[in-house]
Amino acid sequence: MRLRDLARLCVIGVVGLVSATTATEGTYNPRETFAPFDMGQAPTVTRSADGRPGPQYWQNRADYTIKAKLDPASKSISGTVEIRYTNNSPLPLGVLWLNIEQNRYRTDSRGVLSGGTAPAGFTEGMSLDHVQLVRGKSAVAVQPFISDTRARIALPAPLPHGATAILRITYHYKVPMDPWGGRTGWMDTAGGPIYSVAQWYPRMAVYDDLRGWDPLPYLAQEFYLEYGDFDYSVTVPANWIVAGSGELVNEAEVLSPRERARLAEARKSDKTVVIRSASEIFGSTKGWQTWHFRMQHSRDVAFAASPAFVWDAARMNLPAGRTGLAMSVYPPQAKAWGRSTEYLKDAVERFSAKWFPFPWPNSVNVAGPAGGMEYPALAFDDIDSPPAQTFWVAAHEIGHSWFPMTVGFNERRNAWMDEGFNTFIDVYESDEFNRGEYGPKRDSEYAPKGGNPVDQILPILADPEAPPILSRADTVVEKWRHPVTYFKSALGLVLLREQILGPERFDPAFRAFIAAWAFKHPTPADFFRFMDSYSGEDLSYWWRGWYANNWQLDLAVTAIKPFPEKNALKGSLVTVEARDRLVMPVTLRVTFADGTSRDVRLPAETWIRQASTDVPVVSVSSVVRAVLDPDHKIPDKDRSNNDFSTR
């Protein structure tokens, strides 16, 4: 390079000069770190090379009409579901697969063995009493083949493209007891039982463009479901409250005039309005009542029911002038729950403004069993959590209404996407709610020991037993589920936003990804391609190092020396070195002999050809000290070599 060319580059800042030296320690190999990343999924007409849905993207549809009864005497649910399944795929379908996750609680389920230890209780699973294929006004009985938590139905004739099959299924099951019910169950309280009811009807498995039918068995991880509309009714004892996904459509039949008036007041109020107070919880009443709900464009619905619920609500202010209701139901002994609706309202409003508008009219937080579990526009949370934990869990679980309820990730394979993406948006909600009342987020999901997240992650990266983020969800044991699936995944996005791309590039890309894949089924490859394309960066080094592997980062300053005498410019060369396999952009802070300092931003490409690079710093005053990552923002495993001084 000619001297005037070097001078031209130095005038606009700092340029990395290739040093002839290589690292004398560590395992850094630039060809390995910066090799093209294999996405594991080739672009097609259904999924484009830039990460968007392709011009011929398709997905099937499942619409549900459900009528069920919850009988507290037998602790059972019985019901009938009519499923309208539309085949939008280009191929005819000879069979249909359904999920019957209640079979997870059978003694012979795969989930029992995969858990590694005996659960505290069992049920007989879900009984499919009658299964019919509806044709006009007639119905033909079909015999399902039951395989663990799946049911396969062979059709008399293949279902062609564009056609709809209608299934009518009568079923029943016993609701598992808390705590061994896990994601669903019942518990007793002083005011009566609380039921958190989920996986409560046969649900269609997904047939997609990647694997065809994808009915992985339910091993107590999460779900992959099709979108559609729901019309469901739940019959309970007359004095019970039912809180469900979607919108209650028969208020006049199940609520008193006083409750309806209070609900109308809540729809206009930014402050929490009590719909049913603790003093209005009353004892047993004869008879039954049916609560009727509808929800559009959802992949699932769940509900909670109890005679012991206090109920409050407030208006949510959503983009484009829309409003909705944030609601909470909880027993009187749930001491921290008086602010639950405030937490819920704030999270939904901020997530809507920052990332993507909340698509449904209501959001609900339920105190009861199955604590810390999410369903569309509804969360099941713990009764006894202290205030900070109640806030964090409420924000996290309702945040799942974005991931995976709106952006329909395959949780059963890629739990890190919904948990990590959701924990990521929670980090900023914790910082912003009520001027940081509960910030920063430090809980079981993110930096659980309370320190700097980039330090907290280091033992996980160093542990050879820790699985990489890109692991099938069912293979991640409980020890690593929160550290990897939640924490590492979320921190990867925080680092991508704050250190690699910057909010000015990350935020528009992330919003565009959500909008492109709303109510669709993106994969990890779709996300990686989208962020590469939208941000204008090849992030292969990051996807490989942080997501496909547990590579560690060790950047070092090894020398400070003056410019060669033949240079027309005055300045210093600061030698920075990569000593392990992960690299990322970093700030270099240089201090001059005159006491002033300057920050220099080094891109990841500083180490794209070699482990050691000389960074030119133009200044009349010589550099006497150089520090990498002075503000402690990146997960450098050895900070002792980040600081170099000539004095």
Set out the residue ranges of the language-model regions.
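Solvent-exposed beta-hairpin/edge-strand motifs
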Residues: 93-138, 237-240, 591, 595-601
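Hydrophobic alpha-helical and helix-loop surface patches within well-folded domains
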Residues: 30-41, 45-47, 61, 293, ...
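Glycine/proline-rich low-complexity spacer/linker segments in large multi-domain proteins
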Residues: 108-122, 172-230, 251, 632-647
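Short, hydrophobic/aromatic-enriched beta-strand segments in well-ordered soluble domains
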Residues: 81-83, 87, 98-102, 155, ...
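Beta-strand-rich binding/interaction modules
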Residues: 243-244, 556, 562-629
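Early extracytoplasmic/domain-onset interaction patches
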Residues: 27-99
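Hydrophobic helix-coil surface modules that form long, contiguous segments used
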Residues: 202-208, 212, 219-395, 424, ...
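A surface-exposed beta-strand-loop module
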Residues: 26-28, 76, 86, 114-190, ...
